Amino acid sequence: MANLRKTHPLLKIANDALIDLPAPSNISVWWNFGSLLGLCLAAQILTGLFLAMHYTSDIATAFSSVAHICRDVNYGWLIRDMHANGASFFFICIYLHIGRGLYYGSYLYKETWNVGVILLLLVMMTAFVGYVLPWGQMSFWGATVITNLLSAIPYIGNSLVQWLWGGFSVDNATLTRFFAFHFLLPFIIAAMTMIHLIFLHETGSTNPAGLNSDTDKISFHPYFSYKDLLGFAILLIALIALALFSPNLLGDPDNLTPANPLVTPPHIKPEWYFLFAYAILRSIPNKLGGVLALLFSILILMLVPVLHTSKLRALTFRPLTQFLFWLLIADVAILTWIGGMPVEHPFIIIGQVASFLYFFIFLILLPTAGLAENKMFA
């Protein structure tokens, strides 16, 4: 009689994804971030569920309800700090995961890649609406600034913004619907993650050599199941350490002040993981242009497979493109720094140069380097 896990309709799916899955024997720790993102999502849904049990999405009580969670709910402070910092770890993992995909040519699995970009957009949207919920100063003003960007859309912009707000400013209706979105979106993300995996398991994983690994596969369990557990342990230890020792390190002090529509904070800026996109938005002196650049800074990832010119998949044996890849990483770091700086000289010009370089690397330099390397290898 065959093993139940290989015959049962449901267990068979789990078996083919987590136990008997053939995996390349040489995938490095860079292939751990997919499972780490799954862990992040599970942790965020779990902590978020417990927070939602005590949170009230009303402007009169939202801020106080978060204070109540931290002061009066058993381990509420821990749940809140794990959830807030869990978002940062989520983005660290997602950016490393995307970086791995860019470096090793994983984007050539187009369906998997495009679902991944949609997942990135969904996670960013979830983080944005979630940041509004504590109803602190930066929550309120961040929501005001970012939702206002929709008014740049010709003709329907203003109506669209008021429709999104549910009034003439960010108010109670806005907070209530953002809570609804923030509760709903993670489950949509979980569903999209399943689709992401279905597409991935059609082709299997890439590997650090960028070569076909069909001749050299090992089973996912026990090798990579245990490797993933090691990753889980490291991530959870780091998250718990941050949540226990320095829970406010990555937050904005302005958000410890309740929202006040009459007082604008001196520097409105998002959380660190949005700063690179915020810098690109600010570097264009035209509202609509800035919004389009902001959108395109993420959507450009969908163009990467189309712009792939090299005969080789990974950057492992492509020194020219490797240099450009690390230039891109440095550029994103500079954009992240600029996004948190005030709009004044010399930060304005640095931001504009870095924004130009960001698009120039993706659209011009990487495809050109690929062609040049083809010539070199010919």
Curated annotation (Swiss-Prot):
The chain crosses the membrane at residues 33-53, 77-98, 113-133, 178-198, 226-246, 288-308, 320-340, 347-367. Belongs to the cytochrome b family. Binds 2 heme b groups non-covalently. Component of the ubiquinol-cytochrome c reductase complex (complex III or cytochrome b-c1 complex) that is part of the mitochondrial respiratory chain. The b-c1 complex mediates electron transfer from ubiquinol to cytochrome c. Contributes to the generation of a proton gradient across the mitochondrial membrane that is then used for ATP synthesis. Keywords: Electron transport, Heme, Iron, Membrane, Metal-binding, Mitochondrion, Mitochondrion inner membrane, Respiratory chain, Transmembrane, Transmembrane helix, Transport, Ubiquinone. It comes from the Eukaryota. A ubiquinone binds at residue 201. InterPro entries: Cyt_b/b6_C (IPR005798), Cyt_b/b6_C_sf (IPR036150), Cyt_b/b6_N (IPR005797), Cytb/b6-like_sf (IPR027387), Cytochrome_b (IPR030689), Cytochrome_b_C_euk/bac (IPR048260), Cytochrome_b_N_euk/bac (IPR048259), Di-haem_cyt_TM (IPR016174). Heme 1 (or BL or b562) is low-potential and absorbs at about 562 nm, and heme 2 (or BH or b566) is high-potential and absorbs at about 566 nm. It holds the Pfam family Cytochrom_B_C. GO terms for molecular function: metal ion binding; ubiquinol-cytochrome-c reductase activity. It is a multi-pass membrane protein. This is Cytochrome b. GO terms for cellular component: mitochondrial inner membrane; respiratory chain complex III. The cytochrome bc1 complex contains 3 respiratory subunits (MT-CYB, CYC1 and UQCRFS1), 2 core proteins (UQCRC1 and UQCRC2) and probably 6 low-molecular weight proteins. Its cofactor is heme b. CDD domains: cytochrome_b_C, Cytochrome_b_N. GO terms for biological process: mitochondrial electron transport, ubiquinol to cytochrome c. Gene3D superfamilies: Cytochrome Bc1 Complex, Chain C. It is found in: Mitochondrion inner membrane. Its main location: mitochondrion. SUPFAM superfamilies: a domain/subunit of cytochrome bc1 complex (Ubiquinol-cytochrome c reductase), Transmembrane di-heme cytochromes. Heme b b566 binds at residues 97, 196. Heme b b562 binds at residues 83, 182.
